[in-house]
Curated annotation (Swiss-Prot):
It comes from Saccharomyces cerevisiae (strain ATCC 204508 / S288c) (Baker's yeast). It is found in: Mitochondrion inner membrane. Residues 67-403 are mitochondrial intermembrane. Changing residue 296 to S: Loss of function. The CHCH domain contains a conserved twin Cys-X(9)-Cys motif which is required for import and stability of MIA40 in mitochondria. A motif (Cx9C motif 2) lies at residues 330-340. The keyword Protein transport applies. The keyword Cell membrane does not apply. Monomer. Interacts with the FAD-linked sulfhydryl oxidase ERV1 and with the substrate proteins COX17, TIM9, and TIM13, forming transient intermolecular disulfide bridges. Interacts with FCJ1. This is Mitochondrial intermembrane space import and assembly protein 40. Coiled coil: none annotated.
């Protein structure tokens, strides 16, 4: 496709002479076929089109000129007429015929381009087709193309020779470097072997000369090893003892610190004494000592009034009672205390109010139980009435049932 486009662009819009156009196409195909590198570069395509255009113009002018000479000396034609006669016959046509031919060629130019891209040159002279290979076989363009091919081949051969020379030189350099490395390695190995041999000889001679000295050294080394092992064992035992003693000391210190803290708390409590709130919340009876604090504010001063003795006897009875449930044997003493409180309402007004408040719900409970209890007499009367009614109903039924 690329070559066909180049041929069309090079040979289009030229003077409408079929012979010149056919030569232009033929020469462009020969040039492209002879140059293998054609089409790789856009610059080459442009130059080829420009050259083909110039050649087509030159051919057209040559065929239009009256005194023309043959274009190629070695041209051959199969027909009886020579190329010059055919061209002269085509050139000596009348101007009217030339105009007609020009108009026809312009109209059918594109069709001829598409038909004659591969094999035919396109022009018809006297009804005979001139083949592209027969119009010009040994032209100057072919010679130039061959020279270009030769020059490119020479360049390729020169480059290949240079590359082969470079490769040979690099291979030689690598070989020499490898040989030098091998020589250096062998020399180093030989030196090491000689040094090892000398050391072995010196060691053998020293052993032969001083066997007793070597035995002494061995015994000394063994003693030193034993000493080091014993020292290590002693150090481990000491470290274990230290750790045990440290742990014991830490435990003792912790215990002593706890005891000291408790003692300090007790001393502070004794010095500070109980606060008013603590005294109020504490009970009158101390279970540790088994004594009763009659001055305790929780008793409300009842132990020091006119009924103090009755209160003390009742309270101590409740505290020291061993009966279960506790306080059953102290009920009578408690009743005597309440009777004493009623004699002195001025001193025990609050206590009497509390006892009255406690007795009211008890009285209400008793009343409710009495009211809720069924009346035995009324129940008996109701039962008798029901029995009489049932007897009355049965008697008429029995009378009706008799015949």
């Amino acid at each position: 496709m690329l070559r066909n486009l180049v041929v069309r662009n090079a040979c289009r819009n030229r003077p409408s002479i079929q012979v010149a156009r056919g030569l232009c196409r033929h020469q462009t195909r020969r040039l492209m076929a002879s140059s293998p590198q054609f089409g790789r570069n856009s610059n080459q395509e442009k130059t080829a089109g420009f050259i083909m255009g110039i050649l087509s113009m030159a051919g057209a002018l040559y065929f239009i000129a009256p005194n023309r000479k043959p274009l190629f000396a070695s041209r051959k034609v199969e027909s009886d007429k020579t190329a010059e006669e055919e061209l002269s016959s085509g050139g000596e046509q009348s101007p009217e015929n030339e105009d007609d031919n020009n108009s026809k060629s312009d109209e059918n130019g594109d069709d001829n381009d598409s038909k004659n891209d591969e094999t035919e040159a396109g022009p018809q002279l006297g009804g005979d087709k001139i083949g592209a290979s027969k119009v010009a076989e040994d032209g100057e363009l072919v010679v130039l193309a061959e020279e270009d091919n030769k020059s490119s081949e020479d360049k390729d051969t020169d480059e290949s020779k240079v590359s082969t020379k470079d490769d040979e030189q690099s291979n030689e350099d690598n070989a020499t470097a490898n040989n030098q490395k091998d020589e250096n390695i062998s020399s180093e190995n030989s030196e090491e072997n000689t040094s090892d041999k000398t050391l072995d000889n010196n060691a053998g001679s020293s052993e032969k000369k001083d066997p007793e000295h070597s035995d002494d050294e061995k015994s000394q080394q063994g003693q030193s090893d034993d000493k080091t092992t014993t020292e290590d064992n002693n150090g481990e035992e000491e470290s274990s003892k230290k750790t045990v003693s440290d742990s014991e000391n830490s435990a003792k210190q912790s215990e002593s610190s706890d005891e000291e803290k408790e003692e300090l708390r007790k001393q502070e409590e004794k010095q500070m004494g109980p606060t008013e709130e603590e005294v109020q919340h504490e009970g009158a009876y101390n279970p540790d000592t088994g004594e009763i604090n009659w001055d305790c504010p929780c008793l409300g001063g009842m132990a020091h009034g006119p009924c103090g003795e009755e209160f003390k006897s009742a309270f101590s009875c409740f505290v020291y009672s061993e009966a279960e449930p506790k306080g059953i044997d102290c009920v009578e003493k408690f009743q005597h205390m309440q009777d004493c409180f009623r004699k002195y309402p001025e001193h025990y007004a609050e206590q009497l109010k509390e006892t009255s408040d406690d007795e009211e719900p008890q009285d209400k409970v008793k009343v409710n139980t009495i009211e809720s209890a069924p009346n035995v007499s009324s129940a008996k009367e109701n039962a008798a009435k029901k029995a009489e009614q049932s007897d009355v109903k049965k008697e008429p039924l029995n009378e009706e049932s008799k015949p």
